[in-house]
Amino acid sequence: MNRFVIADSTLCIGCHTCEAACSETHRQHGLQSMPRLRVMLNEKESAPQLCHHCEDAPCAVVCPVNAITRVDGAVQLNESLCVSCKLCGIACPFGAIEFSGSRPLDIPANANTPKAPPAPPAPARVSTLLDWVPGIRAIAVKCDLCSFDEQGPACVRMCPTKALHLVDNTDIARVSKRKRELTFNTDFGDLTLFQQAQSGEAK
């Protein structure tokens, strides 16, 4: 099981502090400054959406240059290897991969890019992925758990309500055990007598 960041929508206040922290941290390390997570809002609650670091990682499967790999229990993307094909963004079932880029320094700002033909029409479902701007290289960006920072993900550290948590195998096993215990209590009654009996047998 990979590590990933999970959000508690009951604590999230939709302040976008996590997005700002993510953007600034990556910018300081020379990476694309686009936030690796996006706060989603509805009428009742809010919560950030970000990479789930899937076990099968469809984004890594479709990447033609192996820019996306599994490293230290997380799915990491090497921006320097990205060739802007956008297959990973199309393959991601959670829409957790965005594309960002900047104009190379040797291309003047007044280059004749406005005269270039517009991007060809695309289905609404993938239109944002297929949009392009002449002279700007689109780089895939996704949550990397701030692997370059010993303190861990900036979003987790900076969230004012502690709505974000980094979880790993141990955390998942503990929660799973607790859920099983609660289910047993619901179906078979109080566990206390059962646990006492088990303790007595052990003695």
Swiss-Prot record:
Cofactor(s), names only, from the UniProt record: [4Fe-4S] cluster
SUPFAM superfamilies linked: 4Fe-4S ferredoxins (SSF54862)
Ligand binding ([4Fe-4S] cluster 2): 22, 143, 146, 155
UniProt keywords, alphabetically: 4Fe-4S, Electron transport, Iron, Iron-sulfur, Metal-binding, Repeat, Transport
Binding residues for [4Fe-4S] cluster 4: 63, 82, 85, 88
GO CC term, one of those recorded: formate dehydrogenase complex
Any Pfam family: Fer4_11
Keyword Metal-binding: yes
Binding site for [4Fe-4S] cluster 3: 51, 54, 59, 92
Binding site for [4Fe-4S] cluster 1: 12, 15, 18, 159
Single annotated GO MF: 4 iron, 4 sulfur cluster binding
4Fe-4S ferredoxin-type domain segment(s): 2-32, 42-72, 73-102, 137-169
UniProt-listed GO biological process terms: anaerobic electron transport chain; anaerobic respiration; formate oxidation; glucose catabolic process
Bound cofactor: record note: Binds 4 [4Fe-4S] clusters.
Function: Probable electron transfer protein for hydrogenase 3.
Assembly, per entry: FHL comprises of a formate dehydrogenase, unidentified electron carriers and a hydrogenase (isoenzyme 3). In this non-energy conserving pathway, molecular hydrogen and carbodioxide are released from formate.
Name of protein: Formate hydrogenlyase subunit 2
Organism name: Escherichia coli (strain K12)
Name of encoding gene: hycB
